[in-house]
Amino acid sequence: MKGRGYLVAVLVGLTAYGLVLGCDRIPGKPTEAQRPLLSSQVSNFNEIYGRSCAGCHGGDGQLGAARPLRDPLYLALVRHDTLRQIIAQGVPGTTMPAFSERFGGGLTDKQIDIVIDGMQNRWGRPQTFTNVTLPPYSLEDARAVGAETGDLERGKTAYITYCAHCHGPDGSGGAKGGAVLDGAYLALASDQALRTAVIAGRVDLGMPDWREAVAGQPMTPQDIADVVAWLASHRQRLPGRPSGAGQGS
């Protein structure tokens, strides 16, 4: 009985102690600094990038399934407003989702700017391209400087000249590069994704950019438009299905 009375006294004392100090001083309650932030309150680039981008683009911006973002050429090629639109709205018809809250994602406008500024500050090298005339990023931009819509015959010739030594003469892959005419790949890669790959290469995989495929002979805006058109012309309506499958019986 004596031991039980002592225990009761201790509990009463602790209760009184808690009442005196108030709820904010309850032992074990996290401090303000220890409380987890709401996702919309996170303002650290590494955390936002890690949650939203690393799964596809790689933990340090490279060697992911999607385009490397740790690429000074790519960051110099794409305008801030274009990059912002891509992140905010996603790319329809591809695996790039919309991240803006306004389009069903989880990032605020401020967080999207943090991602863009963080990539530019960490991985951008704008001074490297001060005296370099970059190709137009999009086909629309290319048309503005006189490039025509891509031509398939010219595109095949451009492919043989600039791409076949890595990806094979028939696009089925070679010693250095994968199959670029694979139906599943072309179903996942938009025309703009193909264009970006031709211009910027894949710095993390050793794929050359538009200047490097043939020494001393950089691709022109027209070459780029032509080879992208030729690649895109090989898309299948139902990739992965044998020819004739699904037709009426």
What are these regions (language model features)?
Residues 35, 42, 46, 58-88, ...:
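Gly/Gly-Pro-rich "capping" loops immediately C-terminal to redox-active cysteine motifs
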Residues 1-39, 110, 116, 120-127, ...:
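N-terminal export/targeting leaders of redox proteins
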